[in-house]
Amino acid sequence: MSGHSKWATIKRKKSATDQKRGNLFTKLVKEITIAAKMGGGDPAGNPRLRLAIDTARSNSMPMDNIQRAIKKGTGELEGVSYDEITYEGYGPAGIALIIETATDNKNRTVADLRHIMSRNNGSLGENGSVSWMFHRKGSIEVPGGSATEEQLMEVLLDAGLEDIGGDAEGGYTVTTDVHDLESAKKALEEAGIAYENAKMDLIPENFIELEADDARKVIKLIDALEGNDDIQAVFSNMEISEGAMDSLDE
């Protein structure tokens, strides 16, 4: 199993904790509102909204909350207007970071970002400083026991499959072309294969392998960033070395 897959496993474990944070629904509501504003309130004709609703429902968000967020996006209800801004920078050990935000106050957000980065051995960079290292892809997590790698390949071969990575819990992370995420989800559903956390992801061309001490520092920084209500997603090119996983689990 690659170090990147190990990091995916850690992120999956972290998600259970993240869901206890008060900011989870805030982030989901923002994404639904923005998606509805950009592409309309009908999920059948708005793939981004459809994906946002699926994510919200998988995290047990009540339908009333989802509908209110949609109506705020379409203007049927009064709501806050959000700007989507992407920041780039570096974390400990030279790890590249892309930070996607949705904010109603740009000055507050960038001040918070600088504060978090400076306290955690990170720094913001210029636009384009690290984005060239990443490509946007579709990503689907398939939990352990849902399917074998061979079954996934058979089901997804004609649905935009680009890569399958295993994790320590027997599950898989499926990577697709950015335009084929919906097709891959549909193929899994038709095959009766359970999946979770289907999303658009930013995958780096190359990874930097870290030992446990540096990996802890990067994870601490990412935790701090993800704890901010204005930050929707954080992507990095961190890979965890083969010998570091046990230390990180301690």
From Swiss-Prot:
Molecular function (Gene Ontology), one example: DNA binding
Domain of life the protein comes from: Bacteria
Claim: Cytoplasm is one of the keywords in the record: yes
UniProt keyword Transcription regulation present: yes
GO cellular component, as recorded: cytosol
GO process annotations (BP): regulation of DNA-templated transcription
InterPro entries membership: Integrase-like_N (IPR017856), TACO1_YebC-like_2nd/3rd_dom (IPR048300), TACO1_YebC_N (IPR049083), Transcrip_reg_TACO1-like (IPR002876), Transcrip_reg_TACO1-like_dom3 (IPR026564), YebC-like (IPR029072)
Family indicated by similarity: Belongs to the TACO1 family.
Record PANTHER family: TRANSCRIPTIONAL REGULATORY PROTEIN YEBC-RELATED, TRANSLATIONAL ACTIVATOR OF CYTOCHROME C OXIDASE 1
Protein name: Probable transcriptional regulatory protein Cvib_1432
Organism listed in the record: Chlorobium phaeovibrioides (strain DSM 265 / 1930)
Lineage, broadest ranks: Bacteria, Pseudomonadati, Chlorobiota, Chlorobiia, Chlorobiales
